[in-house]
């Protein structure tokens, strides 16, 4: 099983790749590659969140299922994800089996917004965990002070 860090790293790579191929839009290959990799980036972020909330993510590419699992765990997801989750899932499967996809620039832009919001949410979660650990360390070290 991949770790939270692994999912974050892989999501960032997918996002970087989709941004890079945007330079070649409207080339069909560039569009399909970007759609596939933005889906992969969001999928991996959702899986990282599921791990952060203490569960193992399901082995699926279905964004709707992964988002539902996150919500069941109490994760507040970007509202715009509801608008594009089916499209993202379709983009992932279409890239593998269908040479032509229905591309929506508006939905692609929304997917990038979702990526950015999830990235911020994951970073905030990890930073709060670091602060909690620092507070625990401080509390424990206070108990080790010599008394006179």
Question: Which residues does each predicted region cover?
Answer:
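Terminal alpha-helical segments
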Residues: 1-148
């Amino acid at each position: 099983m991949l770790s939270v860090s692994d999912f974050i790293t892989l999501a960032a790579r997918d996002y970087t790749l989709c941004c890079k191929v945007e330079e070649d839009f409207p080339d069909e290959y560039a569009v399909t590659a970007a759609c596939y990799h933005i889906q992969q980036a969001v999928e991996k972020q959702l899986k990282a969140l599921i791990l952060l909330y203490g569960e193992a993510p399901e082995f699926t590419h279905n964004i709707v299922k992964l988002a539902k699992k996150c919500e069941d765990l109490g994760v507040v997801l970007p509202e715009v994800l509801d608008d594009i989750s089916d499209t993202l899932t379709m983009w992932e499967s279409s890239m593998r089996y269908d040479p032509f996809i229905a591309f929506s620039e508006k939905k692609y832009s929304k997917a990038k917004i979702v990526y950015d919001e999830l990235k911020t949410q994951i970073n905030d979660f990890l930073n709060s965990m670091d602060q909690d650990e620092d507070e625990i360390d401080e509390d424990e070290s206070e108990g080790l002070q010599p008394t006179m």
